[in-house]
Swiss-Prot record:
Family annotation (InterPro entries): AGC-kinase_C, Kinase-like_dom_sf, Pkinase_C, Prot_kinase_dom, Protein_kinase_ATP_BS, Rho-assoc_Ser/Thr_Kinase, Ser/Thr_kinase_AS
Organism: Caenorhabditis briggsae
Known role: Acts with sax-2 to restrict the growth of both primary and secondary neurites. Regulates mechanosensory tiling by controlling the termination point of sensory dendrites.
Family assignment from sequence similarity: Belongs to the protein kinase superfamily. AGC Ser/Thr protein kinase family.
Protein name: Serine/threonine-protein kinase sax-1
């Protein structure tokens, strides 16, 4: 017998590279099939639209030529490598545990976007790669007025970038902090729009799992759009059951009887609210009790969260709020005892009944069996024109002076607007070297057809300002 060749030990780096290559190849061919189907669907949609409008053959030919030109431009765009140098950083409009959000302008088109910048090292270390991957995948799949649009996603050695439509109206959290409470009419409107957004996500086959005011964004007219889809995977650490496993669930004897005037409670909540929004720990205020349990949960957990938001709109703070997340958790688990309505903030019987139907056992919950159709039958929403709600003016007017107006966002003064440096890292030390961020790049087709140009509008605004100054 001949000598047996010694086994060659394969390094972890080589194994990671092989795994990454396999993922890349699978992703490449899967994407080619998807892109072909999307291209056919766009042409089919164009043909249906032209037939519905009764266009002549010559007009149809002209439309087809324009469409073909757009498809060619899109292919060219897809081959172009995007970097942060393609954008001008205008202002920081948000900050979180893993990065920040900036208002940016794309150099070649002048379009305005909100760019989310996430540090790869933080995402890997905090086990958040599934979070950002879920958000990227769902935003690329969703194409609806109820969901914030993502136009581009790309990466460099150090960071991930999600380039989304900028919604100048801010978010529901900011609106609720500004207002003590909302009227029942306003609450009906915003809860109805949020319900339509949630139903759209459910129709895609996803559970959002993180419905809260921070994730209900407002467009320039004040209509709701849903954002932040990372928890659709159910993998975010502080929303997993094991994070709360060692927390006590029983209430102390005087827990409910402690007097706490509503105004003072609302002030305390508002004071702590923003800190919770920017922390890695978060708050369990809006999470359904079954999410904490080992028996699992269904899409009805999103309807519970909507009920909590409805309570906050009418009362001024969520029903289970406490100074410590541990206390909030105990209140949520013991909701049968802690879901109470303060006597000093009166609301209608219908409103109270609707909240109780949202915040109850999962099997009895409003929306659990019939989804949006079941919610539409609720007496509290009888004045809502569900089919035309997005065409109606919102009950609270959003003031937006220009497409780059950030007055509805928090101020982050004296921030460094230079782009994060992306230093070259040895391949074996790169975050995501095992393929976590393979195929992260995305470019949206209708990004080619946006109309607004930031530079032109700014020039016009300056001209108008000069004209007004000379006439005074």
């Amino acid at each position: 017998m001949g000598d047996v060749a010694p086994e060659v030990e394969i390094s972890q780096y080589t194994k990671d590279k092989a795994s990454c290559t396999r993922i890349s190849i699978e992703s490449y061919y899967s994407k080619r099939v998807t892109q072909c189907a999307e291209r056919e669907n766009r042409l089919k949609k164009l043909e249906e639209d032209m037939s519905a409008r009764g266009l002549s053959d010559d007009e149809k030919d002209e439309k087809r030529k324009i469409h073909h030109s757009k498809e060619t431009d899109y292919l060219r765009l897809k081959r172009t490598r995007l970097t942060v140098n393609d954008f001008e950083s205008l202002k920081v409009i948000g900050r979180g545990a893993f990065g920040e959000v900036r208002l940016v302008q794309k150099h070649d088109t002048g379009h305005i976007y909100a760019m989310k910048i996430l540090r790869k090292s933080e995402m890997v270390e905090k086990e958040q790669t599934a979070h950002v991957r879920a958000e990227r995948d769902i935003l690329s799949e969703a194409d609806c007025d109820w969901v914030v649009k993502m136009y581009y996603s790309f990466q460099d050695y150090s960071n991930l970038y999600l380039v989304m439509e900028f919604l100048p109206g801010g978010d529901m959290m900011t609106l609720l902090i500004k207002k003590d409470t909302l009227t029942e009419e306003a609450t009906q409107f915003y809860v109805a729009e949020a319900a339509l957004a949630i139903q759209f996500i459910h129709n895609l086959g996803f559970i959002h799992r993180d419905i809260k005011p921070d994730n209900l964004l407002l467009d320039a007219r004040g209509h709701v759009k849903l954002s932040d889809f990372g928890l659709c995977t159910g993998l975010k650490k502080f929303h997993r059951t094991d994070h709360y496993r060692n927390w006590p669930v029983t209430l102390p004897p005087d827990f409910i009887s402690k007097p706490f005037e509503s105004k003072r409670k609302a002030e305390t909540w508002k004071r702590n609210r923003r800190a919770y929004a920017y922390s890695t720990v978060g708050t369990p205020d809006y999470i359904a009790p079954e999410v904490f349990q080992p028996n699992g949960y269904t899409k009805s957990c999103d309807w519970w969260s909507l009920g909590v938001i409805m309570y906050e709109m009418l009362i001024g703070y969520p029903p289970f709020c406490s100074e410590l997340p541990q206390e909030t958790y105990r209140k949520v688990i013991n909701w049968q005892q802690t879901l109470v309505f303060p006597s000093d903030v009166p609301i209608s019987i219908e409103a109270k009944a609707t909240i109780k139907r949202f915040c109850c056992e999962a099997e009895r919950r409003l929306g659990n069996h019939g989804g949006l159709d079941e919610i539409k039958q609720c007496p509290f929403f009888r004045r809502i024109d569900w089919n035309h709600i997005r065409e109606r003016p919102p009950p609270i007017r959003v003031t937006v002076k220009s497409i780059d107006d950030t007055s509805n966002f928090d101020d982050f003064p004296d921030e460094d607007l230079s782009w994060p440096t992306s230093t070259l890292i040895r391949p074996e030390e790169q975050p995501g070297r095992r393929g976590e961020f393979v195929d992260f790049t995305y470019k949206r087709f209708d990004g080619l057809t946006q109309k607004m140009r930031y530079s032109d509008l700014k020039k016009q605004a300056k001209k108008n300002k000069k004209g007004q100054g000379s006439s005074d």
